[in-house]
């Protein structure tokens, strides 16, 4: 998640995500999703690529819930992989970004699935692709990025628990065991 992705945007950010922390546990993973405004004249990925191709470079905007997080980097990678110049519009959280997408102020939004699922199910946002190894049971008609030839994007967000660097191994092991117990 942001812990690791932030370094790509801010290499002098003051920490090394590998050297400065001791991993304790992976807490959860969630799929990412690309959704579009319902007014975008596209029904699927190919239509969206055509739509973007007809616009001036930078005219199509994509929102994320912030700067330098995994969704921002996903949007930049998506833009690069399809050979288009999209404009990133960072928000202070996913909620305001989704509201503006549904309100027509933006064309695209890169988000985690839990944040956008209600908008998708209520037909207030149209899903384009999911970042996950397989199609989702909740959205079986939505292809994965890998199916669209964009396999570099095909992973979700992970939420992990870390401690300061050089944590003694016995404490790391205990924290991992307690975390597993609490999470089960």
Language-model segments: residues:
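Beta->alpha turn/N-cap motifs
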Residues: 1-2, 94, 111-116, 131-133, ...
